[in-house]
Design a protein with these regions (language model features):
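N-terminal secretory signal peptides that target proteins for export/translocation
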Residues: 1-13
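Aromatic-Pro/Gly-enriched surface loop or interdomain linker
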Residues: 35-153, 157-160, 262-263, 270, ...
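Structural recognition of the beta-strand scaffold that forms the well-ordered cores
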Residues: 95-96, 152-156, 181-185, 210-212, ...
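An acidic, glycine-rich "communication" segment
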Residues: 102-107, 191-296, 328-331, 339-340, ...
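Extracytoplasmic/secreted envelope proteins and their assembly/folding machinery
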Residues: 117-124, 169, 173, 194-198, ...
């Protein structure tokens, strides 16, 4: 409304209208601190570029057929291991995805995806110093191949809300299921980006959900041990520990989200946080030192667990609960629970094929997934339970497990990757379910080690050998508990299932393939005979 029109109003009305207009104008220029606890009024408040693009170039990457180091087997002690690449081999490891809107900041065009323009330059410099000859690159989502063999992982970084078209969402989902990895960096710790990323991928993968990575997760120990973390801003709630969240696809992280910004720390450009705080925002980011340590571990994790993704990404046909299998046919029934219950897709089928080959037992090669909260499990005397981290059984699940073992069934529990958090959860939850039955180490003379295969010595993974080789002395380790005088609960604290897949799981604490299959077949035989 123009001043001439204002003058035609009654004085009091004109006063009210002028006051209202001034109020709106003042609200528009409120500092971001008036947003929710430093969140800002909108994600646009976070849209500040951290530094200018240095536009440095690295030398050319590796070529198809060239030899290179793969990954260290144990933290701090790289084992030289070369592998001839199958041409064409990717020259790229982690591509920065172009997404979001553009704006002019100062005299420079800036976009959501590139607020920390030098992060991938420094990430790849560090990776190349460790022998990984990959090149930094960028890709628009519409130009992306969505082929993990050509691009093992992609980076989505930003501060504003992450969103994609339905077609893009479907293609990203398939990319992850096929073995690709998506890394989401909130750059400055923007809650707008962080919350939208978690929602986007939670909706994209309804069969899984984000979980906090446990302290002994391979990502924190691939090359360097990240037992503690420092933060340039925020992080008070983490107690000096790293905080990362992953959405598991099998045993690998399909989508990794960093609530605390990584990009500025990777690039060594931290001045932007003072600007954000001056605007009333509360940024959250790792220190330069911790961000670079995470980056140092991320490169070998992508490579090593990319190979896991290739193996576990193959389609698996599950049996159905209503299929009337012959009563003499062995059915591998696996328990679904709130944790990462499907840690090694395809592994059970590999074991069952071995069992079918080595014995006269009729075997169904389709495993069945069981929900203890609602499914009738009376037709399945063998239940398999595995996971990667913490879980809590419901009262219904506990009742179902008690009924199962009291009816003559057997429960076999496996610690996928051999992580401490899952072990602690198993001990706690089995004590809740069977308070009168304690897990005890089975003696090496037990029948379970000599029914189908005579097992006196086993081979463990390099990480477990480094940690406990002298203590284990090559002896198989199984714990068991009796209910009503019958051994019906078996627990492997070291990963048994991973060895069935014949794929290398970096930093896994478990059995190597041949030993895992022999022991797995013996466990099934014992369960069927008792």
């Amino acid at each position: 409304m123009t001043p001439s029109k204002l003058s035609g109003l009654k004085p009091f009305s004109a006063f009210l209208l002028t006051t209202a207009m001034l109020t709106v104008a003042l609200l528009a220029f409120q500092p971001a601190a008036l947003g929710q606890q430093g969140k800002g009024a909108s994600s646009d408040d976070w849209f500040i570029k951290s530094a200018k693009d240095r536009k440095e170039q690295l030398q050319q990457g590796i070529k198809g057929g060239e030899k290179r180091d793969i990954i260290p087997s144990v933290p701090g002690s790289p084992i030289p291991q070369t592998d001839r690449l199958k041409p064409p081999s990717p020259d790229f490891l982690l591509a920065k995805v172009k997404w979001g809107k553009a704006a002019i900041i100062g005299d420079e065009l800036t976009q959501d995806w590139n607020l920390a323009p030098n992060d991938m330059l420094e990430f790849h410099k560090k990776a190349r110093s460790k022998g990984f000859k990959y090149m930094p690159t960028q890709t628009a989502i519409q130009d992306f191949s969505f082929n993990p063999a050509l691009m093992p992982s992609i980076l989505l970084g930003g501060v504003r809300e992450l969103n994609f078209s339905p077609e893009g969402i479907n293609r990203l989902r398939k990319y992850v299921l096929d073995g690709g990895m998506i890394v989401c960096d909130s750059v400055y710790g923007s809650p707008w980006f962080y919350e939208s990323a978690k929602k986007l991928f939670d909706d994209m993968f309804p069969e899984s959900r984000f979980r906090k990575l446990p302290p002994d997760h391979p990502l924190f120990h691939m090359v360097v041990d990240i037992d503690t973390a420092s933060y340039s801003c925020g992080g008070e709630k983490e107690g000096g520990k790293p905080f990362m969240e992953g959405l598991y696809i099998g045993s690998r992280i399909g989508v990794l989200v960093s609530k605390y910004g990584l990009g500025c720390g990777l690039a060594g450009e931290m001045d932007v946080f003072e600007k954000l705080e001056a605007n009333g925002l509360k940024p959250m980011a790792y220190s330069e030192e911790t961000a670079r340590l995470i980056g140092e571990n991320l490169a070998p994790y992508i490579i090593g667990y990319g190979r896991v993704g290739e193996a576990e990404g193959k389609a698996e046909l599950f049996g159905k609960l209503d299929e009337n299998a012959p009563t003499s046919e062995f059915i591998f029934a696996q328990v679904k629970h709130e944790g990462a219950w499907n840690a090694h897709p395809g592994a059970a089928r590999q074991l069952l094929m071995q069992l079918e080959k080595d014995s006269a037992i009729p075997v169904s090669l389709k495993r069945v997934s069981i929900d203890l909260n609602r499914d009738d499990i009376s037709a399945y005397p063998f239940l398999f339970f595995t996971g990667l981290d913490d879980f809590v059984l419901t009262h219904k699940q506990i009742d179902a497990l008690r009924k199962h073992v009291n009816s003559g069934g057997t429960l076999v529990v496996n610690n996928a990757l051999g992580l401490a958090t899952f072990h602690q959860a198993v001990v706690r939850e089995m004590r809740r379910a069977f308070p009168q039955s304690d897990l005890a180490l089975l003696p090496h003379s037990h029948d379970i080690f000599r029914n189908l295969n005579s097992i006196k010595r086993v081979k463990y993974t390099p990480t477990l050998m480094k940690d406990k080789g002298e203590q284990l002395q090559g002896r198989p380790v199984l714990f068991g508990a009796k209910v009503g005088g019958r051994l019906c609960l078996l627990y492997s604290p070291y990963d048994l299932e991973g060895g069935w897949n014949e794929v290398r799981y970096p930093l896994s604490r478990g059995y190597q393939s041949a030993s895992a299959k022999q022991l797995g077949c013996n466990v099934i035989m014992y369960a069927m005979e008792h």
